[in-house]
């Protein structure tokens, strides 16, 4: 499972992909109705595909994006699906040039009925990455190039800022391939790059972002030494004027996603550097105190990763509730299995 969204205690969606009996990746979309998670039929394109992000604007207005493998053209193409309350239908996304693949990775609501997606394009699937941004205006998707599209970079997180704008985060690559945090802001008219702190001598990237207010935005990712070992969480905060680094508990691993807790704090979820260990969660309360929160128990010897997290509005009278999704990697041997965990949610499906 790669993405999750919730509108309330009886309306949540999780998306991802699975390998079918023929060894082909096909999309997965499951809905939680307050009692249990149930699979929906979501066709791929040309018999394949995967979904990386989902956004629910209403019970009959849900978007999911990802990519599908166009084998004859030797490129991956962007994929968008829309749920109308009864079924998923495909909606065309902008086409990329020959041999240039496109991967939308995150979704967020814009002004009015707009929906935005950000991600990356790449030549021959992996070379010369460039950030992408698509906007749905109620009738069609169109490309709105991010700032700095001449640089090798990608965008993997997106959030509405509460004032009609958007924050997109990811990574920009230097001449030697070293990563540095990338943050871009949409002000309603154009994208602009906003400087983000970077630790010299370390490769750093942002993966997820959430905005509690225009002057209270959180971004999470990874900070690693040149050899790639010893990865530690990277957490940045925007106060309306500048991005600053936040000190968090020392964990060997990285957060992939972040969301508000509904009480002035935030949750960040991710994976540990040792893939045989459980996923991890970090919580910051409204007073600024961070703590490490263990996930639910998994099977012995089974590692797990969280890739996305969302708050469930009104889910628990005792406090905010969350859904986190990801996958397991039993004993480091495929196949991966989906993980869906609830925090502060009692009853079936938790």
Feature annotation, model-predicted:
Residues 1-350:
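Residue-level hotspots at or immediately adjacent to binding/recognition sites across diverse folds
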């Amino acid at each position: 499972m790669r993405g999750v969204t919730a509108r309330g205690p009886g309306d949540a969606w999780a998306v991802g992909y699975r390998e079918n009996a023929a060894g082909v990746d096909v999309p997965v979309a499951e809905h939680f109705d307050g009692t249990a998670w149930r699979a929906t039929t979501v066709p791929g394109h040309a018999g394949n595909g995967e979904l990386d992000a989902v956004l629910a604007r209403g019970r009959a207005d849900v978007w999911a994006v990802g990519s599908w493998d166009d084998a004859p053209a030797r490129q991956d193409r962007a994929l968008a699906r829309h749920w109308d309350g009864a079924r998923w239908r495909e909606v065309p996304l902008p086409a990329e040039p020959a041999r240039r693949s496109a991967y939308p990775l995150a979704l967020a609501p814009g002004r009015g009925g707009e929906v935005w997606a950000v991600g990356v394009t790449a030549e021959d699937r992996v070379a010369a990455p460039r950030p992408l941004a698509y906007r749905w205006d109620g009738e069609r998707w169109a490309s709105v190039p991010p700032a700095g599209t001449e640089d090798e970079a990608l965008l993997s997180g997106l959030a509405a800022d509460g004032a009609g704008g958007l924050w997109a985060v990811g990574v920009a690559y230097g001449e030697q391939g070293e990563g540095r945090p990338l943050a871009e802001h949409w002000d309603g008219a154009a994208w602009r790059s906003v400087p983000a702190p970077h630790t010299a001598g370390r490769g750093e990237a942002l993966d997820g972002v959430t905005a509690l207010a225009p002057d209270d935005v959180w971004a999470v990712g990874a900070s690693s030494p040149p050899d790639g070992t010893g990865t530690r969480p990277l957490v940045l905060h925007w106060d309306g004027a500048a991005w600053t680094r936040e000190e968090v508990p020392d964990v060997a691993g990285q957060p992939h996603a972040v969301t508000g807790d509904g009480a002035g704090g935030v949750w960040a979820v991710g994976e540990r550097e040792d893939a045989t260990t459980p996923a991890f969660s970090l919580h910051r309360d409204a007073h600024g105190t961070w703590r490490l929160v263990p996930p639910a128990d998994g099977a012995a010897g089974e590692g797990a990763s969280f890739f996305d997290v969302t708050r469930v509005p009104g889910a628990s009278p005792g406090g905010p509730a969350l859904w986190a999704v990801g996958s397991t990697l039993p004993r480091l041997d495929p196949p991966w299995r989906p993980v869906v965990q609830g925090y502060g949610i009692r009853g079936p499906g938790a």
